Amino acid sequence: MYWSDFKDYLQEYPSDFPDAQAYEALLQIANDNTGRPMTEYTHYNLPVSIELSLRKSISRHWGVSAGLQYTYLSSESSIGEDSKWVKRQKLHYIGLSVKLDRRLYTTRTFSFYATGGGTIDKSVSGKLEQDFIVQKERIYSSTENLKIKPFQFSIHAALGIQYNINPTLGAFIEPGAAFYFKDGSFKNTIRDKHPLHFNLQLGVHWNY
């Protein structure tokens, strides 16, 4: 789509843009970019999750765990050049995870392991922040709350290292990869653009 097409759409369906100031700003941005294609550039920040989990040893090397997980996803996109439309999306998720792990090497202080499992996530809050910039000057900004109803399922695998605080409590870090199944929502996150991607997980294991 070209900016001229978008301008025609704005003029034909102004009711699709209830924020009058945002609508006027988009008209100016479309005018300044006339003749150019509407190319959107998006940067996705690395997702980081924090987890509290309960782990049960089922043999000398194997264990199973269940955890409560918090994840923050954010991205920034822009359309246009000197006059542009900038959008920042921030989403907060709470999830439940189940994992199976195998200890690869253990000392009194550290444990090294491989783990895999699945997670179900639910978005609990989100915001979309928008800046409307005309000739390098921001003329308007807006913020709206996002509501994402569907649950999202994923499977993941990682290598982990745990610092053993005491025999029952350990702090861990897990760099790994995850695959996210589509949830039917219309949000734009790294999970939708790249269903298979690397992530980083931090947390605490309670072992019993």
Feature names for model-found ranges:
Residues M1-D5, Y70-S74, L104, G118-V124, ...:
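Transmembrane beta-strands of outer-membrane beta-barrel pores
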Residues N45-S49, L91-S97, S111-Y113, Q152-H156, ...:
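Transmembrane beta-barrel architecture of outer-membrane proteins
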Residues M1-Y9, P47-S59, S75, K99, ...:
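Transmembrane beta-barrel domains of bacterial outer-membrane proteins
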Residues I148-S154, Q162-Y208:
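Predominantly the C-terminal beta-signal and adjacent terminal strand-loop region
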